[in-house]
């Protein structure tokens, strides 16, 4: 009887130890799974910093063969030059565990932009090779995760390369001072500026603000004459199709012209150098006679004034005289088709 009691007590203690061990093993698996979820790109224990100055590659372990199971690997590529970017190109031999419901849940490779933490992409399966990825700065992060089931082959290989910064053009169209340029070369340099302030800074770097302000001081001259001609209101009639043909056939339309060429002035520079004017254009497809013998010509021409900056060489000394002036350019108000042997189309 005593022996039977000892056997029962020993069995109970053994069962308790077995249950404790099983529970401990289960807790360890859960803890491992939890750690695996947290060991992302933010966990420095799994991150390997790779300093690069040229081309190279990284790949899954044992590439191009079956990669190991239950892994988390992170590479952070850092270019030596801070002004460059990094481009990633995936090898055509790409294959990881297939996605589930089009989501890469188990085995995948992921690329992250460290500057803002955004994920550029996550890929798995073997159907399509991922496209090229480019960093915003001089570093980029790559993460590879495999779970404990169904490893695949060949894994992945990523080739990295350095993208040099693009050379930006200088804001000044000419590095030479205005006094060293001929008038034609200076005209080309002046035309390249996009704002009046940039132009005056180039012409007078030491006193550009004074010169700019003096251009707009009130004078006794009437500057900036702008004569606007009202457009004739269109009368709607039943023959709408014919009116549309007239509208887009021989009609006044915008043309850009060079002021120097229009005024035949080679001794002066104007800014802006080109302006929009109305000039007759289009075809004469609906003329009454042979249309090949018809030409679209202006029927009414007017002069309109445009205020521009005028630059003229000073007499006897170096430098340019700067002033706002009005230039008169021809505008075509009305057009007509003139055919050979007939006054109208």
Swiss-Prot record:
Domain CUB, residue spans: 46-163
Entry GO MF terms: growth factor activity; platelet-derived growth factor receptor binding; protein homodimerization activity
Disulfides per UniProt: 104-124, 250-294, 280-335, 287-337
Ranges of compositional bias, category Basic and acidic residues: 34-45
Glycosylation sites: 25, 55
Xref: InterPro entries: CUB_dom, Cystine-knot_cytokine, PDGF/VEGF_dom, Sperma_CUB_dom_sf
Localization: Cytoplasm, Cytosol; Secreted; Nucleus; Cytoplasmic granule
Disruption phenotype: Perinatal lethality. Mice have feeding and respiratory difficulties due to a complete cleft of the secondary palate. However, they have reduction of renal fibrogenesis. Mice lacking both PDGFA and PDGFC develop a cleft face, subepidermal blistering, deficiency of renal cortex mesenchyme, spina bifida and skeletal and vascular defects.
CDD domains: CUB, PDGF
SUPFAM superfamilies in alphabetical order: Cystine-knot cytokines (SSF57501), Spermadhesin, CUB domain (SSF49854)
GO annotation, biological process: animal organ morphogenesis; bone development; cellular response to amino acid stimulus; digestive tract development; fibroblast proliferation; platelet-derived growth factor receptor signaling pathway; positive regulation of cell division; positive regulation of cell population proliferation
UniProt PTM: Proteolytic removal of the N-terminal CUB domain releasing the core domain is necessary for unmasking the receptor-binding epitopes of the core domain. Cleavage after basic residues in the hinge region (region connecting the CUB and growth factor domains) gives rise to the receptor-binding form. Cleaved by PLAT and PLG.
Annotated signal sequence range: 1-22
Primary localization class, coarse: cytoplasm
Alphabetical UniProt keywords: Cell membrane, Cleavage on pair of basic residues, Cytoplasm, Developmental protein, Disulfide bond, Glycoprotein, Growth factor, Membrane, Mitogen, Nucleus, Secreted, Signal, Ubl conjugation
Function, in words: Growth factor that plays an essential role in the regulation of embryonic development, cell proliferation, cell migration, survival and chemotaxis. Potent mitogen and chemoattractant for cells of mesenchymal origin. Required for normal skeleton formation during embryonic development, especially for normal development of the craniofacial skeleton and for normal development of the palate. Required for normal skin morphogenesis during embryonic development. Plays an important role in wound healing, where it appears to be involved in three stages: inflammation, proliferation and remodeling.
Disease connection: Involved in the development of myocarditis and subsequent fibrosis in the experimental model of coxsackievirus B3-induced chronic myocarditis.
Family: Belongs to the PDGF/VEGF growth factor family.
Subunit structure: Homodimer; disulfide-linked. Interacts with PDGFRA homodimers, and with heterodimers formed by PDGFRA and PDGFRB. Interacts (via CUB domain) with PLAT (via kringle domain).
Name assigned to this protein: Platelet-derived growth factor C
Protein source organism: Mus musculus
Taxonomic lineage from the root: Eukaryota, Metazoa, Chordata, Craniata, Vertebrata
The encoding gene: Pdgfc
């Amino acid at each position: 009887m005593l022996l039977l009691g000892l056997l029962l007590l020993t069995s109970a203690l053994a069962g308790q130890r077995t249950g404790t061990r099983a529970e401990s093993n289960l807790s360890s698996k859960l803890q491992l799974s939890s750690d695996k979820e947290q060991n992302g790109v933010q966990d420095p224990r799994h991150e390997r910093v790779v300093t690069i100055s040229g081309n190279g590659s990284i790949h899954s372990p044992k590439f191009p063969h079956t990669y190991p199971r239950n892994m988390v690997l992170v590479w952070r590529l850092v270019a030596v030059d801070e002004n460059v970017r990094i481009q990633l190109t995936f090898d055509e031999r790409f294959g990881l565990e297939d996605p589930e419901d089009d989501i890469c849940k188990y085995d995948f490779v992921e690329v992250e932009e460290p500057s803002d933490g955004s994920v550029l992409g996550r890929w798995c399966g073997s159907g399509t090779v991922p496209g090229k990825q480019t960093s915003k700065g001089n570093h980029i992060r790559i993460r590879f995760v495999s779970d404990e089931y169904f490893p695949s082959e060949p894994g992945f290989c990523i080739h990295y390369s350095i993208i040099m910064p693009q050379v930006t053009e200088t804001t000044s169209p000419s590095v030479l001072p205005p006094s060293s340029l001929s008038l034609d070369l200076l005209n080309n340099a002046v035309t390249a500026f996009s704002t009046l302030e940039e132009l005056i800074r180039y012409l007078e770097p030491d006193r550009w603000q004074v010169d700019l302000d003096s251009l707009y001081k009130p004078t006794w001259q009437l500057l900036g004459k702008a004569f606007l001609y009202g457009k004739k209101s269109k009368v709607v009639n039943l023959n709408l199709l014919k009116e549309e043909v007239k509208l887009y056939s021989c009609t006044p339309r915008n043309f850009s012209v060079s002021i120097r060429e229009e005024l035949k002035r080679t001794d002066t520079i104007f800014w802006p150098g080109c302006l929009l004017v109305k000039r007759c254009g289009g075809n004469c497809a609906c003329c009454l006679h042979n249309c090949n013998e018809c030409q679209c010509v202006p029927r009414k021409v007017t002069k309109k004034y445009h205020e521009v900056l005028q630059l003229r060489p000073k007499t006897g000394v170096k430098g340019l005289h700067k002033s706002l002036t009005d230039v008169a350019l021809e505008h075509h108000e009305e057009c007509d088709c003139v055919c050979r042997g007939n006054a109208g189309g």
